[in-house]
Each structure stands twice: as structure tokens, then as C-alpha cells.
Amino acid sequence: MTWETVIGLEIHVQLNTKSKIFSGASTAFGAEPNAHASVVECALPGVLPVMNREVVEKAIKLGLALDAKINQKNVFDRKNYFYPDLPKGYQISQLDLPIVEHGKLEIVVGDDVKTINVTRAHMEEDAGKSVHEGLNSATGIDLNRAGTPLLEVVSEPEMHSAAEAVAYAKALHSLVTWLDICDGNMAEGSFRVDANVSVRPKGQAEFGTRREIKNLNSFRFLEQAINYEVEAQIEILEDGGKVQQATMLFDPEKGETRVMRLKEDAQDYRYFPDPDLLPVIISDAQMQKAKAEMPELPKEMAARFVADYGVSDYDARLLTASRAQAAYFEEAAKESGQGKPTANWMNGELAAALNKAGLELADSPITAPRLAALVGKIADGTLSSKLAKKAFEAMWAEPEATIAEIIEKHGLQQMTDTGAVEAIVDEVLANNAKAVEQFKSGNEKALNAIVGQVMKASKGKANPAQVQELIKAKLA
């Protein structure tokens, strides 16, 4: 039997506000346990929540970026459950009236572009966490994270492979960091993914029983967990068993999922409207202000890069993976006047060097003006492609040196003396009679071999295009 995988993702996006969603306590990461737990998070008698305006503003931003419906009346609900890291005994969330509904997000998987519908994004508070280490078999409660503002972004179950799920998660991660509503730090829990996974016979309309894999904090773990879970469910079904709805944990060391608890449904949480919070009304004026303050979005900027700088669609997508990368490219391309070559260097040598050194673009020793200077020297004929790579390596190692200093110090200037180049060409032709005869017989590959010999003899300083013209003229 052929099986079809069905995946929906619920992603918790931690908003980068300085204070919590319902109190003035700090959201800073890494403090001593409970240093940022106010009376609201501790649920002391008589305390009341006060809504953080910035949370609403950031949620609106995401809704606009997802081309979604934004509900201007927002009601909060209590999600009731007992857990030690939730002193109130309930979590404040949104059930029936989320701030964002019916959005969409475009993903790219290989050469395919696909749109995934976003069901909703709702505001809620995070819970605290239990601490087990260093407490002599006891369990401690750290409420620093409690009350941190979250947007839970829920997709439609429209992904059919781990690759699509990872592409969706990466696209949303890129979008929320682009909008500057989340720092995107997965290691610190700023972007956590829950994957709802089920399988069904190919062609069947009805969904299979889903299992939810909780708190995946890396794209690699997301891919591994989904692939394992799909195989596990198929094995159960092919052995004649039934998949039981459950909440799963992923063990990255073993590379497998395991049951955490039998899955609860919405009715198990006994949702009801929170009587301590008035409805939040977003005015038309606030909506207009939010629209006016929206930055240029990645898709729009990518289209502009294609139109203005002549880069390919593929390069444009890479260049708009982050605002920092897009800004770097635009600065370098404007300064050099060379859009496509700038994109090639950024997506090629620069990306490889950053990856090898484990550096972010912001820490690159080759700044946008320095890359523009390098590309400019290639465009004006000072550097050949081969010499430019040597210049790039020298610029990386000598961050204070100008391109002119690099060229002079390392003797990288391309040969401009036509007579000297012609002399090398004559010598190579005289010493490569076989290749010459092959070219004259119509073998174009022989020309490349002769050009290669000239470049070798000139130590890469001859202009390949000029060399090719000279060879063709002499052998005509």
C-alpha cells in the first residue's frame, strides 16, 4: 500500500518585547531563577493582568505579512490545566477569536513553489519551567519564562513531507526575524515547533490519527522527528494496529519519538473567557498606522532585486533570506554598479568563507564596501576571476587593507600589456601543436585547453577573453 504523509505545524513565536504580556516584568533570557517573576506570574491573590500594547502591534505586523484577516476585536480565554510551572492553574490564550486568521505563506522546496495556508495566529502567555538539575532529586520551579508573550502560529495540514515542513518552518522563521518581532534564537526557545503528523492511504480523503511531536527546537530535529514518526505510524498500520492519538517527545540522541502522554482535546482544557481582561479593540487608525510602518517584505524585495539588479529568482531568494543580507547586497550592488556579479560573490565565496569560519554576515571581515571594491576591479579589468579569488582570500586575512593595497602587495594586477600577452600566446601555440591541430579541425574543447595553458604561463594574470580572441585570430 502507498501511504501519504499529512503534516500541520504549530509554531510558538516568542515576541521580542522587553516586558511580559500581562506585567512589567523583564523578558531577558538567562537571569537567575525567578529573578523576573512578578506578582502576576506568581499568581498572588488579588493581582490583575494588564495587556502589553506592543504584543498586539507585533501580532498585527505578522498578520499583515501573512496577508491574513486581522480581527480588530480580541478576547482572551483561560486554558485550564494543572502543572507546577503554572501557578494560576490556567494559561491566558485566545480560543474562538484569534488576532490573526486565514493567512498564507509561500515556501520553496527544490524547484517547486507552494503556498501553505495559515489557519490562525493567537496571542498567549508562556508557562514557566521545571528545573531538575542540581536539586538533589527535588524539582524546582523557574517562573522567569512565565508570562513571556507568544504568538502561536497554526498552519493547515497541507504539508506532505519532512522537507516541506522544514521549508515552512524556515520561511516563518525568516519572516518573523525580518519583521523584527522575534529574535529567532531556537536554542533559547524563541522559536519552538510542534509537529502534528499522520499518515493515510494514498487517495483517501479522511485524515489518519495524528500524533503531536512537541518542542522541536532545531530544523534538523524537526526533519528527523517527522521522518521517524512517519515510519513508526506506517509500521503500526501495516502490522494491523491502530495509531493512538498522543503527545510525543523527540529524543535527539536516539533519533526517535516516544509517547509523552495521551493527547488531550480542546474540551479537556475547559476554555472560558477570562473575566479579568476586557476585549482588546484595534481601531482603524491603529490598523492604518501599522500598514504604513510595514517594511518591504522579502517577496517584494526579491522581485525588486530581479528587476533592478538583474539577479536570478534563485539568487534573489537567497539574498532576501534576512534583512541583514539584503541590506549588505543592496549596499554593495549600488556601490559597484554590478548586481549579478555581487550576488554571485555573496552567494558563493563569501557564503562559503562565513560558513567555514562560523561567522555571521555582520562579523564578516569583508564589508559591503570592500566587496563592492573587489567586484569593481573585476568589472574594470584590473582583476581576472582567478586573481579576484586570491584577492578575496587576502582581503579576508587583512581586514584593514584596501583593494588597491591588496593588489599591489600581492602582485595581483591583470596584465594590460597586449604585447606581453601575445608573446605568451605565441609560445604556448608553438609548444602545443596537437591542441592547435585539434582546434583547427573543429574541436572547441581544444581552445579551452590552449587558453588554460596561457593562463598558467601568465600566472593567472592574463585576461581570458583577450587570450581567447588572440588565439582565434592567430589560428584563423
Swiss-Prot record:
One short Pfam name that applies is: GatB_Yqey
- Keyword RNA-binding: yes or no? no
Q: Name one GO biological process term.
A: glutaminyl-tRNAGln biosynthesis via transamidation
- Which species? Neisseria meningitidis serogroup C (strain 053442)
Query: Where are the bilayer-spanning segments?
Result: none
> What is the catalytic activity of this protein?
L-glutamyl-tRNA(Gln) + L-glutamine + ATP + H2O = L-glutaminyl-tRNA(Gln) + L-glutamate + ADP + phosphate + H(+); L-aspartyl-tRNA(Asn) + L-glutamine + ATP + H2O = L-asparaginyl-tRNA(Asn) + L-glutamate + ADP + phosphate + 2 H(+)
NCBIfam families membership? gatB (TIGR00133), PRK05477.1-2 (NF004012), PRK05477.1-4 (NF004014), PRK05477.1-5 (NF004015)
Q: Does the keyword Nucleotide-binding apply?
A: yes
The EC number(s) this enzyme carries:
6.3.5.-
At the highest ranks, the source species' classification is: Bacteria, Pseudomonadati, Pseudomonadota, Betaproteobacteria, Neisseriales
Which SMART domains does the entry link to? GatB_Yqey
Purpose of the protein: Allows the formation of correctly charged Asn-tRNA(Asn) or Gln-tRNA(Gln) through the transamidation of misacylated Asp-tRNA(Asn) or Glu-tRNA(Gln) in organisms which lack either or both of asparaginyl-tRNA or glutaminyl-tRNA synthetases. The reaction takes place in the presence of glutamine and ATP through an activated phospho-Asp-tRNA(Asn) or phospho-Glu-tRNA(Gln).
Q: What name goes with this protein? A: Aspartyl/glutamyl-tRNA(Asn/Gln) amidotransferase subunit B
Class of the enzyme per the UniProt entry, highest EC level: ligase
